[in-house]
Amino acid sequence: MEDFPPGTDLTAHPNDAFFKAIFSEPEQAAAFFKSHLPATIADRIDWPTLAVVPASFVKSSLQQVHSDLLFSVTLAGRETLLYLLFEHQSTVDPTLPLRLLGYVGEILTQQHKSHGLPLPPVMPFVLHQGPDHWNVSTDFEDLFELPDDIAEDLLPFLPKFHHALLD
């Protein structure tokens, strides 16, 4: 089972503790992903290679950042690595795409430092278990307010980023 960040009060976050306890087991995570990822992706994954990898990052500001769970897996018949970033949310957070983009950036930076190019894809997946339905966008570009008359010209310069969501 994955360790929680030092100083984490597990009783203050029982849903997160339960989520991590269950899904840090590769067999449980694989069963979940197989039934919730798009079939075109799930069918290409070599599931026995699914492994939990460290999900803590030290930013350049020396601030430690923790995502919930991170898995690596290879695609069937290839040496291509795929990361599955698994985040648990109990509240609706309109800024979640920004936080996820930060995690993806840290994962790719670490990957580049240790293995160079090409970079592996990182697929963020959010499991929302809260009292309210998820009613905010899962697309990063929707965090921006773009003037109608130049939005089309600005869009190519914004990061294109989306996260999968199970509400």
Region spans (language model):
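Accessory alpha/beta interaction modules
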Residues: M1-D167
